Amino acid sequence: MATVRICVCGDESTGKSSLIASLVKDQFVNNKIQPVLPQITIPPSIGTPENVSTTIVDTSARPQDRTTLRKEIRKCNVILLVYADHYSYERVALFWMPYFRSLGVNVPVVLCANKSDLVGQGTTPQVVEEELLPVMAEFREVDSCIRTSARDHRNVNEVFFLCQKAVTHPIAPLFDYKEGHLKPLCINALKRIFYLCDKDQDGYLNEQEMRDFQARCFDKPLTTDDLDNIKLSIAKSLPASDLEKGIDLPGFLQLNKLYAEKGRHETIWIILRKFHYTDSLSLEDKFIRPKFEVPEYSSAELSPAGYRFFVDLFLIFDKDNDGGLNDEELEALFAPAPGLPSSWTDSSFPSSTVRNEAGHVTLQGWLAQWSMTTFIEPKTTIEYLAYLGFEPSNPKDSITAALKITKPRKRRSRLGRVERNVVLCYVLGASGAGKSALLDSFLNRPFYGLYHPTIKPRRAVNSVELPGGKQVYLILEELGELEPAILENRAKLDACDLICYAYDSSDPDSFSHIVDLRKKYPHLDELPSIYTALKADKDKTNQRCELQPDQYTSSLSMSLPLHVSVTWGSISELFVAYADAATTPSTAFPRSNEEGPDRTSLYIALGATACAGVAALTIWRRATNAL
């Protein structure tokens, strides 16, 4: 916010214009001033909240000026409502506050008891108790109240500072004065902040964690005396607190409640804004959704910093050290986020990744799941990195430092290995071919033999070690009833690294589905592919199609189908073959007999010959010149 616009309202002769003049002149103006002062703008100075400019608009309460008054009230950020005697005080509740509500404005109101220099006005505690607090209790939009005197120049600067602070650090979203407690949204935000600062997740902010919190929020060290005073304040309100271990969540919330009760709500706002909260107590959109675009033919992956963050997160929340995250540990881990990512719920997490015998997500499965999420929905990963507290090593970097963009692989047929650590393979085939069992086997699940048709798309992700030792994450996706829509979607196919054509070698009608599929979608020829004969533990049968699978693949100058069974221990070699083909796509392309020869080597040879000829000519010319 660049400017705070203050609308000064109140009955006639309450001293509105005198307050403004006293602020500008820094003293009381004895000369008669005009009934309504022109609008003034004051630039920010030292101590101005959030370094904002301030525009002050004087108004008239006369009925003939009501149109202008309505217009100014609707344009302002805060209303300074001034009264000066019993009559104008009564009008605060009877006219002014209902009038503001009738206009539908939702701005804070600062209530000002002016002309405190006059005899018979009472003491400040008496005025606060008898006049100001009842109005604040009745009208929640009243942010604060103060006694002033333009003649004595008493609290003149302070009243306008309160107006500025009511906009830059509003109390209304934080604290309910009537009920005397922090509001739910504020509590939720502070709970998340506590969670992020409790680095060891023991339920307490220890001395070092408090010092780190102080440095982050207030850019100054926390002395031992300061920490002792904080603990003393908490102990007075919560005598049962165990402050020897540190400050627990109830103590942290109580501390912030004390700030609100003492009018130090700007302290709470400093904390909230350091953790990227807006005035509506939601996280800043630019924080959880920073700009991040994946160029065409490229993909997104976790960077080393991103993997390190998720490894650390796993180790912290695996409280029982059993090597897996159970439901309670996952719930605690995702406490500062709005639950699991919706894509995880849709894919029936954790069944989409690696689990141990107890059904708990292993570290391998945890990293594989995030690798898949980053590949398919990088913006979801970025959003959850923000929720879960990722902090880049360089303060100038954004959360996107946890991700990296791969080199584009526009020409899949180019020789060599693509620089990708996460690859996607679509598993296509007839119903009952064994695709679901293949995905289960990929996740080390036992084979049950019961057939359940796949309706929704299903994914499985796991790490695979390539020949040479490099590890990649392989995503196998069974398309279900969305198969036609996905195979017609060029963007979906561009994201795919490999097609696995799977058929049941014991079913005579299984392979014809693949033949028909390739005829229906000829653009599938543009993708690298592998043919897989599943259920090889059963008796092999001839397929009812023009060419048998071996003949069909040979006619395409491709490798013969890989014969495997999910009941065999060697099934893991199949997934290595998939990952290897996905990362070296030139080895898995169909080539028809009509396709011309690969002239790459010829072009290289001709280029070398031409370079040699130019060099020889240059040497001959130099030799001739030398003669």
UniProtKB/Swiss-Prot annotation:
Sorted alphabetically, the Gene Ontology BP terms of this entry are: mitochondrion organization
Using the record's annotation, list all stretches that form the EF-hand domain.
Answer: 185-220, 305-340
Entry's transmembrane regions: 600-620
**Could you tell me where this protein is found in the cell?**
Mitochondrion outer membrane
What Enzyme Commission number(s) does the record list for this chain?
A: 3.6.5.-
**Start and end residues of each Miro domain:** 1-169, 420-584
Q: What is its main location?
A: mitochondrion
Q: What class of enzyme is it?
A: hydrolase
Q: Which residues form the signal peptide?
A: none
Q: Got a GO cellular component term for this one?
A: mitochondrial outer membrane
Disulphide-bridged cysteine pairs: none
Chain ranges sitting on the Cytoplasmic side read 1-599
**SUPFAM superfamilies reported in the protein's UniProt record:** EF-hand, P-loop containing nucleoside triphosphate hydrolases
Q: Which residues lie on this side of the membrane: Mitochondrial intermembrane?
A: 621-627
Residues annotated as binding Ca(2+) 2 are D318, D320, D322, E329
Q: Which domain of life is it from?
A: Eukaryota
Name one molecular function that GO assigns to this entry.
Answer: calcium ion binding
**How does the entry describe its membrane topology?**
Single-pass type IV membrane protein
On whether Aminoacyl-tRNA synthetase is a keyword of this UniProt record, the answer is no
Residues that coordinate or bind GTP 1 = 10-17, 58-62, 114-117
Q: Does the keyword Metal-binding apply?
A: yes
PANTHER family in the record: EF-HAND CALCIUM-BINDING DOMAIN-CONTAINING PROTEIN 7 (PTHR46819:SF1)
Summarize the protein's role: Mitochondrial GTPase involved in mitochondrial trafficking. Probably involved in control of anterograde transport of mitochondria and their subcellular distribution.
Entry's family note: Belongs to the mitochondrial Rho GTPase family.
Instruction: Please state what the protein is called.
Output: Mitochondrial Rho GTPase 1
Organism (species): Gibberella zeae (strain ATCC MYA-4620 / CBS 123657 / FGSC 9075 / NRRL 31084 / PH-1)
